[in-house]
Amino acid sequence: MNYMMTDNEVFKEGLAGVPAAKSRVSHVDGTDGILEYRGIRIEELAKSSSFIEVAYLLIWGKLPTQAEIEEFEYEIRTHRRIKYHIRDMMKCFPETGHPMDALQTSAAALGLFYARRALDDPKYIRAAVVRLLAKIPTMVAAFHMIREGNDPIQPNDKLDYASNFLYMLTEKEPDPFAAKVFDVCLTLHAEHTMNASTFSARVTASTLTDPYAVVASAVGTLAGPLHGGANEEVLNMLEEIGSVENVRPYVEKCLANKQRIMGFGHRVYKVKDPRAIILQDLAEQLFAKMGHDEYYEIAVELEKVVEEYVGQKGIYPNVDFYSGLVYRKLDIPADLFTPLFAIARVAGWLAHWKEQLSVNKIYRPTQIYIGDHNLSYVPMTERVVSVARNEDPNAII
């Protein structure tokens, strides 16, 4: 619903479609299905680049030279380890806690260990970028191991970024093709213009706080079910469907009841999500190499049936539809799917943090007040007693 404020101001719920920044970081054309990072098509980057090179491109605004990428990779490899204080803090977290909550807390805690310096200091910016890219995956893997009752697996400096994360979950070097698929998944999730978590990052950055608080803010936003977690819900849906034979009845039931089919449709893309096209091809290769399972067969049939019914309305699989299948095939627990999103999106958040600093003006929107006016203060003895709720008075809230 829109509410007119003045001749030049319009209120929109959720700021839907309202430009909140000018940016050079990424571009989406939802009509033609185009996603570009710094002007380069995602298809080219997925085919020819690596996640670390893509992170460099997003954050520094250009493709690195051989010397630049080697230095960047070396810096990240040598900063992967986290301080034992962080590990000890994680051991105090409840093992039933969600990994995103653990990640948000741990990311914020990094700011305690690295002195805040001037945000116009290139060395400070470089160090913060390296630390966050290097340590976020380690923190995700460490909390997972700790909640399982195990000691965290130390990073393997011989392995690349994607391979090292998979190694820290199992202490086994991953299959090279599986690691490559995971690396492409990180690239596909690294950035996607202005969304809730990126907006949160830019708002936080605009206050000139430290970059660890910026990333913690974005992680907290991504943790919400309306933003992250869709690929986990796709797996829950596939489990509910149960078999290929149940796909068509399930789709018909959802359409009849106007229920959402997880992993389909996008607020921006009116055609098939270009990231989903890339992931579909990679998933086919991965399952061909490592063996099909029933989830994959159900997903293939589901895509076919959904497109048959509603493809003409521009409802196609999005990136979440296949990413969950890929992560499951890589033996990654489902509740780590959103932390994986965060690992990748740190690159985009840092790019927007750096861009916000270059043109900074603190975000200060306004509101439309819709409450009461001119009410009188009522003394306690004259207030109407509300009906007591049936709650345990001794319960801890």
Swiss-Prot record:
One of its GO terms (cellular component) is cytoplasm. One of its GO terms (molecular function) is citrate (Si)-synthase activity. The keyword Transferase applies. Pathway: Carbohydrate metabolism; tricarboxylic acid cycle; isocitrate from oxaloacetate: step 1/2. The active site is at residues 266, 320. Keywords: Transferase, Tricarboxylic acid cycle. The keyword Transferase applies. Citrate synthase is found in nearly all cells capable of oxidative metabolism. Belongs to the citrate synthase family. This is Citrate synthase. It comes from Synechocystis sp. (strain ATCC 27184 / PCC 6803 / Kazusa).
